[in-house]
């Protein structure tokens, strides 16, 4: 009887996946996908100096990669993406996001000898709008101050839990312009 339930469950799951694939033209015909192999030197590399904590927003994927390259961190970072980036660590509604970040830092330190954290927030962030409210974001200056406050809280949390790590904080515009956010930011 249990075996029959297992077979029926597997059939339902496979049928659901096939139905999804049939209605999703992007992946429907993709049985095997070949992607370019990593650079040869990366295959045996065991160290990533940095964890990048960035937003999940699809609009800035290329710009984020370009930033990491300009910072000299291309091929030497692990990436953690959650809505709001630094806000994921400090928000009070989804506290498990913060725990996820902390647990990830802990394990990546053991695996990759992490030395620093880079938080990359971005302007016009939907998570910020939902979790802290548009009234704190409705001008460029208010938005920068809101991000700076959250980035500084995130920096403090990381420094307290992982005092050996350096922490850097950045704010990216949708135009790709990136500002480093320092601890002593004040509205101008």
Swiss-Prot record:
Signal peptide: 1-21
Highest rank taxon of the organism: Bacteria
Record GO terms (molecular function): carbonate dehydratase activity; zinc ion binding
Key words, A-Z: Signal
Pfam families in the record: Pro_CA_2 (PF20393)
InterPro entries per UniProt: Carbonic_anhydrase_sf, Pro_CA_2
Protein name: Uncharacterized protein RP050
């Amino acid at each position: 009887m249990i075996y029959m339930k297992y077979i029926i469950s597997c059939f339902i799951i496979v049928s659901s996946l096939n139905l999804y694939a049939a209605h999703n033209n992007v992946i429907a015909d993709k049985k095997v996908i070949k992607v370019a192999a990593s650079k040869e030197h990366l295959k045996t590399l065991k160290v990533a100096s940095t964890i990048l904590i960035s937003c999940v927003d699809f609009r800035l994927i290329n710009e984020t990669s370009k930033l990491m390259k300009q910072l000299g961190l291309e091929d030497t970072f692990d990436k953690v993406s959650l809505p709001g980036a630094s806000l994921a660590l400090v928000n009070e509604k989804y506290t498990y996001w913060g725990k996820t970040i902390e647990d990830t830092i802990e394990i990546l330190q053991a695996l990759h000898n992490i030395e620093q954290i880079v938080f990359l927030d971005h302007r016009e962030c939907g998570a910020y709008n939902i979790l802290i409210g548009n009234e704190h974001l409705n001008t460029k200056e208010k938005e920068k101050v809101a991000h700076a406050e959250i980035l500084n809280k995130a920096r403090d949390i990381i420094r307290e839990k992982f005092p050996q790590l350096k922490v850097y904080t950045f704010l990216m515009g949708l135009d790709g312009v990136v500002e480093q956010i320092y601890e002593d930011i004040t509205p101008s």
